[in-house]
């Protein structure tokens, strides 16, 4: 393994993307894992300049606790009918930690662990809550087979080394308690060097960093990057398992070539940086092995806006089998990692 942990030992540019016939999260492929990506509300205590307008509000719009409990039960019932009894619940917002019952929700999931093959939880957060909140969180998180956090680093709010270190200390606390951490940094090209320096600040403290390309508000191609910038985004900051002593590079997604050979990337976001996210007319397990909940509406995925499965109030129906993808591309990594394969296979 390279002593320089900033760069990947694995050359992602060698992957023959035009010859790939199937891909997916390793856990979803190998462990029959059902994936739930749930936006608990759009309320956020931040208002970042580059945040998409639809992604946040200053009005508190949290999903009621009883609705959350009933939804969890119904998801598990339908998923089990399809043969899935391992679950990954990814909770986000807005800012999910300001949901008044966030810790109650993950306690509810923890109370049913013994009735599942396993349960994992994930949180996407700006981690602005005080460290006291995280001390409560880790006591619940340790009950799960796996708990993880994507911590969104926003330069407009973490504008001093003191604030950055306070942010890091919360994450190091969680990592010391077995929670897998990655810090998500949207690489605005106008501040690229500054943001790369901030990424190194955390990376040097043995915290994973995801350097994420910036997209315009309605999706589409990346904003303008130089070749050097794009190379850094595509190859920098490999994800490592810092909860293990050997810090091995962690590979999340498995890809299969048409000759049967296997390729790997450490995170689905890496595929998007290479522009490998157009799976229209492929068979996709979105809606069958995973769903997206936006406030009170249930969707097949984030990108499949036209394919509604129902609502939390009136009921929803998960697909009984994989279906053809009808969307031009997967705009976020949550969609990209869902297992899928070419129709001709």
Where are these regions (language model features)?
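N-terminal [4Fe-4S]-dependent radical SAM core
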Residues: 1-37, 82-84, 330, 335-345
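Accessory C-terminal segments flanking Radical SAM cores
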Residues: 2, 219-345
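Canonical Radical SAM [4Fe-4S] cluster-binding loop centered on the CxxxCxxC motif
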Residues: 23-70, 303
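Glycine-rich short-loop/terminal segments
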Residues: 43, 52, 74-78, 262
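Short catalytic/ligand-binding loop motif for oxyanion handling, primarily in non-cytosolic enzymes
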Residues: 47, 57-60, 98-100, 131-132, ...
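Radical SAM/AdoMet-radical enzyme domain recognition
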Residues: 72-77, 81-90, 99-202, 208
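Active-site beta-strand/loop signature of hydrolases that rely on acidic residues for catalysis
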Residues: 93-94
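Classical nucleotidyltransferase
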Residues: 153-273
């Amino acid at each position: 393994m390279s002593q320089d942990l900033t760069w990947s030992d694995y050359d992602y540019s060698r992957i023959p993307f035009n010859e790939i016939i199937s891909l997916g999260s390793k856990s979803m492929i190998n462990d029959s894992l059902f994936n739930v990506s749930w936006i608990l509300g759009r309320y956020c205590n931040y208002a970042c300049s580059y945040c998409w307008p639809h992604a946040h509000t200053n009005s508190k719009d949290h999903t009621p606790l009883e609705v959350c409990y009933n939804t969890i039960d119904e998801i598990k019932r339908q998923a089990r009918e399809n043969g899935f009894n391992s679950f990954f619940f990814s909770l986000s917002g807005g800012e999910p930690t300001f949901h008044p019952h966030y810790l109650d929700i993950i306690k509810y999931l923890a109370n049913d662990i013994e009735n599942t093959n396993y349960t994992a939880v994930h949180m996407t957060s700006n981690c602005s809550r005080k460290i006291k909140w995280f001390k409560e969180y880790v006591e619940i998180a340790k009950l799960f087979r796996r708990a993880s956090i994507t911590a969104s680093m926003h330069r407009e709010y973490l504008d001093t080394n003191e604030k950055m270190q306070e942010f890091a200390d919360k994450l190091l606390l969680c990592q010391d308690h077995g929670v897998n951490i990655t810090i998500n940094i949207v690489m605005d090209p106008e501040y690229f060097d500054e943001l790369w320096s901030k990424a190194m600040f955390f990376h040097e403290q043995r915290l994973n960093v995801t350097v994420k390309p910036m997209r315009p508000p309605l999706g589409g191609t990346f904003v303008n990057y130089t070749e050097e910038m794009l190379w850094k985004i595509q190859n920098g900051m490999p994800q490592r398992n810092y909860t293990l002593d050997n810090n091995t590079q962690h590979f999340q997604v498995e890809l299969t070539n048409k000759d049967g050979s296997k390729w790997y990337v450490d995170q689905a976001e890496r595929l998007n940086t290479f522009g490998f996210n157009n799976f229209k007319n492929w068979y996709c397990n979105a809606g069958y092995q995973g769903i997206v909940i936006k406030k009170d509406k249930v969707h097949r995925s984030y990108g499949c806006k036209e394919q509604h499965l129902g609502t939390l109030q009136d009921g929803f129906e998960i697909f009984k089998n994989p279906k053809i993808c009808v969307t031009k591309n997967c705009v976020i990594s949550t969609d990209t990692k869902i297992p899928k394969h070419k129709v001709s296979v």
